Structure formats: C-alpha cells, structure tokens
Amino acid sequence: MRGVEDIKTLNGSVCWITGLSGAGKSTLGSEVVSSLRDEGVIPILLDGDDLRSLLGVSTSEFSREERLRLAFVYADLCRYLASQGVVVVIATMALFKEIHDWNRENLPNYFEVFLDIPLKVLKERDSKGLYERFSRGEVHNVAGLDFEADFPSHADLVIGVEIENRQATVKEIVKKILGQ
C-alpha cells in the first residue's frame, strides 16, 4: 500500500481521448488512469457516457449545435479541474474543430489522442448497438453518419485500427502526461 509520501504532485493536465462511437475511448482512458495510479498519480477519468448520465443528458436526438455546447461544458470542466492541479483523462467523442482549437489554447499541459478507427470496423464492432439502431432509423444525429465529424488535424497521438502494443501505447501517453 502506498503512503502519502508516494503520491506524486503534478501540475494539472488534460489528456483528451477522442474518436467515433465504439472506437475504444473509454477502454483506453481506463487503462491510462490505471497506469497513472501505478505511478503514484491520482488522476480523474471523465467518460462521456458517464458525464451525460450524471448531467441527465441524452444525446440520442441532439443536434450538432447541442453536442458542441455539451463538448464545451466538458472542456471547461477539464480546465477547471486542471487549474487545481488535477490530472484529467477524458474519453469523449467531441469531434469538433472548435473544441480541438479551444482545448489547445485553454487547457494546461494538453495532450490529444485520436482513435482513428474506420467506420466499417466500428460498424462491425458495434459494441453499443448504435450503428445497427441507426441503420434501422431508430436514432439520428450520429457523428460520422448523419453529420460530419471534425477529426483532429493536430492530435499528439493517432492510433489506427489495432494498437500494435497496447502497453507501449498506454506507457507513451502516461510519459507525456508525466512530462517525461
């Protein structure tokens, strides 16, 4: 068990993990947080699904503008937490150029990870059944389908279909967060 003296104190930072639905954002975010804890850092994980639930928001029929407004709420929450020295790992879609630009200018020690998974692969995985429900006309306003997603043009790390070495990828992200 670690003692208080083993806890690392860092300046606040934000690791923003983004990609389309089903890309693996939550999984990667959880792995990064676990690895940070192993390093003696006490991070916070903000997951888009959990945040929407906590805020009582359903995005199933959200317009692009409403999703953008919610993404700014997430970004501002990250800024608030990081300004108090918190290491924030956020796993959320928020695929808007406006958000990417704002984050780069306003979030301290910002590190952006883009999970660049082809739509064909996401439809095959369809872990939440979203793409199937979309094809049946049950849901609308799905990023990458109904409306175009703005993929990050300056992500610090881009991950393709399969992570060759998941441990190495998590380690790379953690090193960046720790400033190594």
Annotate each language-model stretch with its function:
Residues S21:
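The conserved Walker
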Residues K25:
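Conserved lysine of the Walker
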Residues D50-R52, A94-K97, D116-V121, E164-N165:
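Conserved nucleotide-binding/hydrolysis micro-motifs of P-loop NTPases
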